[in-house]
Amino acid sequence: FMCDEMERSVHDALCVVKRVLESKSVVPGGGAVEAALSIYLENYATSMGSREQLAIAEFARSLLVIPKTLAVNRAQDSTDLVAKLRAFHNEAQVNPDRKNLKWIGLDLVNGKARDNKQAGVFEPTMVKTKSLKFATEAAITILRIDDLIKLYPESNDKGQSYQDAVRSGSLEN
């Protein structure tokens, strides 16, 4: 079992290296991209004067699911960590002197935000771009469904619904 797991880990690492070489660029990991994009889109949404503002703001909010999930999976306080992450990325976008904060991502081992460029925590740009694109396309597909899917109660062999069969006691042995 241990050898299989090691083989998968080495394979995964080689795939990451392959993606980095293909895309020739990396982005900081640990939710940094999602936090930065969320802040940017929230600011952009406030400049809109139409109903599109609501959709953009909600999409921006949805991007924070990634850093929140990272924190929750590591049993960390996701609210506090994501708030700090957002504060760093907001500062990086509004203050030109603090542009270096754009590299801040989550350090889940120590439960804090850190400079992931210095820590060497990166993701291939191609992987990040594709994952955001596919997730967005999946959400759009779901939103385009305009049919009501109705499930009818199951019926047993006597023509009764499951709830009726439970009430009548016909399911008991």
Curated annotation (Swiss-Prot):
InterPro entries: Chaperone_TCP-1 (IPR017998), Cpn60/GroEL/TCP-1 (IPR002423), GROEL-like_equatorial_sf (IPR027413), TCP-1-like_intermed_sf (IPR027410). The keyword Chaperone applies. GO terms for molecular function: ATP binding; ATP-dependent protein folding chaperone. GO terms for cellular component: cytosol. It is found in: Cytoplasm, Cytosol. Keywords: ATP-binding, Chaperone, Cytoplasm, Nucleotide-binding. Its main location: cytoplasm. SUPFAM superfamilies: GroEL equatorial domain-like (SSF48592). Belongs to the TCP-1 chaperonin family. Component of the chaperonin-containing T-complex (TRiC), a heterooligomeric complex of about 850 to 900 kDa that forms two stacked rings, 12 to 16 nm in diameter. Component of the chaperonin-containing T-complex (TRiC), a molecular chaperone complex that assists the folding of proteins upon ATP hydrolysis. This is T-complex protein 1 subunit alpha. It comes from Ambystoma mexicanum.
